[in-house]
């Protein structure tokens, strides 16, 4: 059947113009991206406090070390894309990057945080190893170029409204700044109102552009569906994560919390910290067979 959505060689045209500019494998501290070894990006959605963020970092670090998966810790200093103006956003750039810098120093972990404005990129880059472009902002040229100019690795989350092959343009914006250290994250596609679905074909499509990570927690989000905030279906996190690992992703992105019902952001789609170890053990077993 013909149609603009059909997966054909023509849909990979952006891959042909950008793939030579992207590193298919690169290091982020001790983590090798695109090496064939599955890696993990995990942490709370937002910095709720220094003590809480540090506690989560240390707990996730222990679990990752025990099961044998390389870890990049993540947390946000500002959630600028919340549904409501009344929602908690975080401590802000100055205090948030201070906290993330201390956690990176004390744990030895590489750290990821998201940036929302070009002016934030250089400041955040002084504290963290990976700058993340939020899905809602994945077409913002100035933001992508500014992130690329820092020299830090850049994780671009695919917008809920973007075709996977069109992410080649986002990749090219980062590489135009002379930075080949780019990877992409799938986090679901809008399917009607307040709902997301995951098209696993996108993982194969985007791997022609750059290394690919699957976000198993935001993919089960039901955006803006819970009275001024987002809901979620966390019971499907293991289902989608297993499928993504079997499909050959390079890494996994999981937001975890020790008390999801009381999390200050995205608790409805977070993975309970107690469930992280058994999930990772199962995913690593699948990866060993599938790779």
Q: What does each model-found stretch correspond to?
A:
Residues 91-92, 109-120, 129-142, 153-164, ...:
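Catalytic beta/alpha-barrel core
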